[in-house]
């Protein structure tokens, strides 16, 4: 079963209260229409504001059940393994949307239902004085909460909770505190928080964790398994009758997704982004010509790219400068896409389970960094949909499909670094679908292909930051942008990157004196 063109809801701000009442006013970076819902259950209401594409009716993002205790679910994003999930439900009419599907699963499995779901979603469910907050296995739709006795607030954007922090939330031992936002916590990836509304106490149950064991497979079997898993994940993300759009760099990751999407849909649109100092247009063109896609190249001047740093921080709500460097060119690309809202597939994330960015030949060291990366991705928000929904588009990342991820992580390191090549098993899996030059092309990250890392460094150096202090200065710039936009409520258009860089450079110079 393919996906709808766009989810019923991109995000939400929800409030469950013992005394009823409206949810606080929404503050979203996501661009779209807002629809308010209120589902009174006596004095136990669940009120929410959904943000969704103007062309989409959000009805299927909300579901109510009157069997047993009245229950309401609100879901942002989408579920991919619908057919498998339907097969374990009792016979009857099919659920009308993903929110109703979650309710039906909860009736059968309670919170263990989330161990069955493969998707890109965040959800809040209320039944009586019980509130469930759940994320997908990767936390790819971030979910934040502020909990106090008698009230649970939850939002897919932390800034929505930052604007309403009275009363301050309880500490939550199993959730990550959001830096600078008192009482605001991020629900862990692959988890469901079971909250008692009356007391404000919470118990967190893990629904997915990265595997630590490794599988030894013959080359041919491993290659076939990777190809089949990726093709299935891409097909589940392609809407029947719609032409998908793939962000294409010309590397093996994005090109592999493009080849699978072309096979699933029969036709394909692609887009590549570069700057006036660096691009990968030639490499992408090799794939475009091979697959015969409708292609577009977008060039963003470096000064304009760096000026969009506030937007990248505002959208991702990340304070990690390395992650922001990865996300900045993507944020700029999505903002530059004109025309109607699009479903966009990316090759983002393949490097993490395959260890591609480490360029490590020693297998023990490769598996060590891979295990570390899989244990520490949570909270970085690399795949937050807000990076694209701030421009009205929906992105999805097949390499972080749960089945694909489980497979890639589990393969022994010698299948990832083999015959002197990084990501060997993926390259071999796509060898008959892509040009040889693409299959054999060495790894290059989007932040490198667009020159983002070097340009950000040059900006700081030009403001007098010593070379050995550049990374720390980047960290301070990103944190200040976070405090201004996410914590302080300022729109990125009101924040000047040069002013922030200048301020950080001055502080750095004074600290070094």
Curated annotation (Swiss-Prot):
It comes from the Bacteria. It comes from Streptomyces clavuligerus. GO terms for cellular component: cytosol. Its EC number is 6.3.3.4. Keywords: ATP-binding, Ligase, Magnesium, Metal-binding, Nucleotide-binding. Belongs to the asparagine synthetase family. Gene3D superfamilies: Glutamine Phosphoribosylpyrophosphate, subunit 1, domain 1 (3.60.20.10), HUPs (3.40.50.620). The keyword rRNA processing does not apply. It catalyses: N(2)-(2-carboxyethyl)-L-arginine + ATP = deoxyamidinoproclavaminate + AMP + diphosphate + H(+). This is Carboxyethyl-arginine beta-lactam-synthase. Binds 1 Mg(2+) ion per subunit. Mg(2+) binds at residues 253, 351. The gene is bls.
């Amino acid at each position: 079963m393919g996906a709808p063109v766009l989810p019923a809801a991109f995000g939400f701000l929800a409030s469950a209260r013992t005394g009823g009442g409206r949810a606080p006013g929404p503050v979203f970076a996501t661009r779209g229409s807002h629809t308010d819902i209120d589902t009174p259950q006596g004095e136990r209401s669940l009120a929410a504001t959904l943000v969704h594409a103007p062309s989409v009716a959000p009805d299927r993002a909300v579901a109510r059940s009157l069997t047993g205790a009245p229950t309401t679910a609100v879901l942002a994003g989408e579920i991919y393994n619908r057919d498998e999930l339907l097969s374990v439900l009792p016979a009857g009419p099919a659920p009308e949307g993903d929110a109703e599907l979650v309710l039906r699963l909860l009736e059968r499995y309670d919170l263990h239902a989330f161990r069955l779901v493969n998707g890109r979603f965040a959800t809040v469910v209320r039944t009586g004085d019980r509130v469930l907050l759940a994320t997908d296995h990767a936390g790819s739709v971030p979910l934040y909460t502020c909990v106090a006795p008698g009230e649970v607030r939850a939002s897919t954007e932390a800034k929505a909770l930052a604007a309403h922090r009275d009363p301050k939330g309880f500490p939550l031992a199993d959730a990550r505190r959001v830096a600078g936002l008192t009482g605001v916590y991020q629900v862990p990836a692959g988890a469901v928080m079971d909250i008692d509304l009356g007391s404000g106490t919470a118990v967190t149950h893990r629904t997915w964790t990265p595997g630590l064991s490794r599988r030894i497979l013959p080359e041919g079997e491993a290659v076939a398994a990777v190809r089949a898993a990726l093709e299935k994940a891409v097909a589940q993300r392609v809407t029947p009758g719609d032409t998908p759009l793939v962000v294409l760099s010309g590397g093996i990751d994005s090109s592999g997704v493009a080849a699978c999407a072309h096979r699933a849909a029969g036709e394909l649109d692609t887009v590549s982004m570069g700057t006036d100092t660096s691009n990968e247009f030639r490499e992408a063109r090799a794939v475009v010509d091979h697959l015969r896609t409708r292609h577009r190249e977008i060039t963003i001047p470096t000064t304009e790219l760096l000026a969009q740093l506030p937007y990248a921080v505002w959208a991702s709500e990340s304070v990690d400068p390395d992650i922001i460097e990865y996300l900045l060119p993507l944020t700029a690309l999505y903002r530059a896409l004109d025309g109607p809202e699009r479903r966009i597939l990316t090759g983002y994330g393949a490097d993490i389970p395959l260890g591609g960015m480490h360029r490590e030949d020693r297998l023990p060291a490769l598996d060590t960094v891979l295990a570390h990366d899989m244990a520490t991705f949570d909270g970085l928000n690399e795949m937050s949909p807000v990076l694209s929904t701030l421009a009205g588009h929906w992105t999805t990342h097949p390499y972080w499909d749960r089945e694909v991820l489980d497979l890639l992580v589990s393969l022994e390191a010698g299948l990832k670094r083999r015959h002197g090549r990084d990501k060997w098993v993926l390259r071999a899996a796509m060898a008959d679908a892509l040009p040889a030059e693409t299959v054999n092309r060495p790894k290059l990250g989007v932040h490198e292909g667009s020159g983002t890392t070097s340009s950000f460094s040059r900006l700081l150096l030009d403001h007098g930051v010593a070379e050995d202090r550049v990374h720390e200065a980047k960290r301070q710039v990103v944190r200040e942008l976070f405090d201004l936009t996410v914590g302080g409520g300022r729109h990125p258009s009101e924040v000047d990157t040069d002013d922030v860089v200048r301020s950080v450079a001055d502080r750095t110079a004074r600290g070094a004196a």
